[in-house]
Amino acid sequence: MAEKKGSSSEKNLYCTFCGKSQHEVKKLIAGPSVFICDECIDLCNEIIRDEQPSTEAKDGRGDLPTPAEIKANLDNYVIGQDLPKRTLAVAVYNHYKRLRHKDKAGKDEIELAKSNILLIGPTGSGKTLLAQTLARMLNVPFVMADATTLTEAGYVGEDVENIIQKLLQSCEYDVERAQRGIVYIDEIDKISRKSDNPSITRDVSGEGVQQALLKLIEGTMASVPPQGGRKHPNQDFLQIDTTNILFICGGAFAGLEKVIENRTEASGIGFGATVKSKKQRSISEVFQEIEPEDLIKFGIIPELVGRMPVVTALAELGEDALVQILTEPKNALVKQYSKLLAMEGVELEIRPAALKAIARKALARKTGARGLRSILEQSLIGTMYELPNADNVEKVVVDESTIEDGKAPLLVYREAAKKA
């Protein structure tokens, strides 16, 4: 009943859905012989919003961007690394195209295998940023795991199933969405086999973890506790199929270049061999000649190498690339610090010579793009401490001496600026 008569002969209107009277709610909207309150409308909107991601995931999330569009988006955030970006764009495009094909395919259709990706490159070259940018663009659940924290089941440390649990948490335990997500496993080179010879002690954080990752990467049903953990022993685990999860593994693989050089040099012996000095070739150039056998010799087990067919090497970043990273990307460091100072009503100017000095310092530290923030932070820390209490500061100027000699940045005051 939408209407009920009270003792005072006046009509009271009630929500048809929850039964609350017009006096208990803010608004009651009338339809043909029905009424709905504002609270029920809000609840309906929440239900529709919650169901939308699952529907989009099942449908393949609308239009799939082409490899060129994926690369163009990566260009906004990652400087250089053209070949890895192209390789990643094609691999990701083919992966999600494969999922669409799988949804529509009949029993007699050709099955398309999954191509997981291995990124090799020095620290600070953009491996993690590439994976994060991809996941953000495709609007799929993304999780980043550190291989160094993983151990075999039964030992202190994280089990490999914890990776899938984190993926579920990132999409609020929506199983359908999680099964189409992206997992980035960093520092994969740190779990390499410790030696070729079998040892009496167990290698619980090396080869043991690689064995545990095998099935997860290839595709298996992983058992994950439900949200909030199991409340009682009879509560079922969530079953997650990892077949359609794209795994991207990354690592610096320090020392792998020596393995590659030993193999390539061994092929040319005697008077006919071409002699090329090691100093003439950069690490990234050597990595271009990588073969699966090199990874196996490094300590990655053959089964795991076979499950990562797409291997791409990131180049070392030079001075020019580091200067571009400081200024050009969407979230460039200079833009970030300019925004921070703009909140104090102060403009930030970093001169070209200072940018080059920052790049040179990062190169000397051998930390890649990751070292840029600490250098810039170090040069501005004193100024950022004083600025909130300083009056009439219009501009902060960072020049070469600020970076190289540790001098304080130049402060331009409003009165001086007007006179100039």
UniProtKB/Swiss-Prot annotation:
BP terms from Gene Ontology: cell division; proteolysis involved in protein catabolic process
Domain of life: Bacteria
GO molecular function, a single term: protein dimerization activity
SMART domains xrefs: AAA, ClpB_D2-small, zf-C4_ClpX
Residues bound to ATP: P122, T123, G124, S125, G126, K127, T128, L129
Summary of the function given for this chain in its UniProt record: ATP-dependent specificity component of the Clp protease. It directs the protease to specific substrates. Can perform chaperone functions in the absence of ClpP.
NCBIfam families attached to this UniProt entry: clpX, PRK05342.1
Subunit composition and interactions: Component of the ClpX-ClpP complex. Forms a hexameric ring that, in the presence of ATP, binds to fourteen ClpP subunits assembled into a disk-like structure with a central cavity, resembling the structure of eukaryotic proteasomes.
Stated name of the protein: ATP-dependent Clp protease ATP-binding subunit ClpX
Natural source organism: Delftia acidovorans (strain DSM 14801 / SPH-1)
Lineage start: Bacteria, Pseudomonadati, Pseudomonadota, Betaproteobacteria, Burkholderiales
